[in-house]
């Protein structure tokens, strides 16, 4: 993205993956060629310089990826790239023009990278599981808060107006958790299904 194009995003809201406003674009940083390398965003009162690849931009909609979604996106790209190189390298195994020692050295480099990607996937899986458990615990707290609210309303300890306002906030918070859990479960299912195939498996190039 060029500087002249990025101008239209100044003052635009930044959304999270659940369509919530979390900040606003107040500027951007370019390299010497005028390519935008980062947005300057006000998030929760803090000024942050955020690399462009952390955003998904569609039209004037700017979505800031969570750390888990961002890492997942990058790992998928790495996995596709290394799988492509493995497939290409396998096809060169019987090529008489290729020096076998050079092929073996190249093979070792590719396999090393592949194992690093697999390790990163395993670490991501732990993070996803931890976040899912954290959200489920928050869900339990909200359920208890909902019971308390309804009991107070039954006992006439809260006005109807305040009750309805508080009820909306709790239900919105619960829906927010449901939305994030849904996304995390999709990531988790992708990783788990991949582990049952030869996609995420340390390959030995033949």
Question: Where do the protein language model's features map onto the residues?
Answer:
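Peripheral interaction segments used for macromolecular assembly
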Residues: 1-206
């Amino acid at each position: 993205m060029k500087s002249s194009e990025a101008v239209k995003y100044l003052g635009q809201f930044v959304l999270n993956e659940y369509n919530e406003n979390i900040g606003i674009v107040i500027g951007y940083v370019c390299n010497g060629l005028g390519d935008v390398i980062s947005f300057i965003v006000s998030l929760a009162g803090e000024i942050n310089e955020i690399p462009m690849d952390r955003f998904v931009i569609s039209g004037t909609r700017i979505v800031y990826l969570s750390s888990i979604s961002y890492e997942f996106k990058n790992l998928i790209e790495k996995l596709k790239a290394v799988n492509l190189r493995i497939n290409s390298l396998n096809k060169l195994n019987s090529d008489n023009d290729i020096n076998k020692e050079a092929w073996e050295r190249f093979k070792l480099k590719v396999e090393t990278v592949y194992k690093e990607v697999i390790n990163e996937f395993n670490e991501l899986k732990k993070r996803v599981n931890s976040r899912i458990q954290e959200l489920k615990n928050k869900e339990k707290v909200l359920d208890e808060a909902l019971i308390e609210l309804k009991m107070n309303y039954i006992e006439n300890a809260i006005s109807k107006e305040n009750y309805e306002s508080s009820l909306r906030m709790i239900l919105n918070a619960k829906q927010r958790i449901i939305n994030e859990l849904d996304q995390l479960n999709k990531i988790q299912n992708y990783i788990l299904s991949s582990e049952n195939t030869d996609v995420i498996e340390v390959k030995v190039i033949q």
